[in-house]
């Protein structure tokens, strides 16, 4: 029988807490005309990347989604990329 005390224990994985890139003093403003900024939060297929991946706060994620949808409607961003 194997003694439980002899089995090596793993250290728990510690994930670094990310901060929202849109909060702070030098944070960029979310604007539907700033296509270069908005493209960083769209996947290569044209979908909006979720906030758990981009670490954007809930309030700013809603603003970001609204700005992306406005830019799509005006033809600044594509709806889908083939």
UniProtKB/Swiss-Prot annotation:
Residues 1-20 are annotated as: Disordered. GO terms for molecular function: small ribosomal subunit rRNA binding; structural constituent of ribosome. Signal peptide: none annotated. GO terms for biological process: translation. Keywords: Ribonucleoprotein, Ribosomal protein, RNA-binding, rRNA-binding. It comes from the Bacteria. One of its GO terms (cellular component) is cytosolic small ribosomal subunit. Part of the 30S ribosomal subunit. Forms a tight heterodimer with protein bS6. Belongs to the bacterial ribosomal protein bS18 family. Binds as a heterodimer with protein bS6 to the central domain of the 16S rRNA, where it helps stabilize the platform of the 30S subunit. PANTHER family: 30S RIBOSOMAL PROTEIN S18, SMALL RIBOSOMAL SUBUNIT PROTEIN BS18M. NCBIfam families: S18. HAMAP family: Ribosomal_bS18 (MF_00270). This is Small ribosomal subunit protein bS18. It comes from Brucella suis (strain ATCC 23445 / NCTC 10510). The gene is rpsR.
């Amino acid at each position: 029988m194997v003694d439980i005390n002899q089995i090596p224990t793993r250290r728990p994985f510690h994930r670094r807490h990310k901060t929202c890139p849109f909060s702070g003093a030098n944070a960029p403003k979310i604007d539907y005309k700033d296509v270069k900024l908005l493209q960083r939060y769209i996947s290569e297929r044209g979908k909006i990347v979720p906030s758990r991946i981009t670490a954007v706060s809930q309030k700013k994620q809603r603003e970001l989604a609204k700005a992306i949808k406005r830019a799509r409607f005006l033809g600044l961003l594509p709806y889908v990329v083939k």
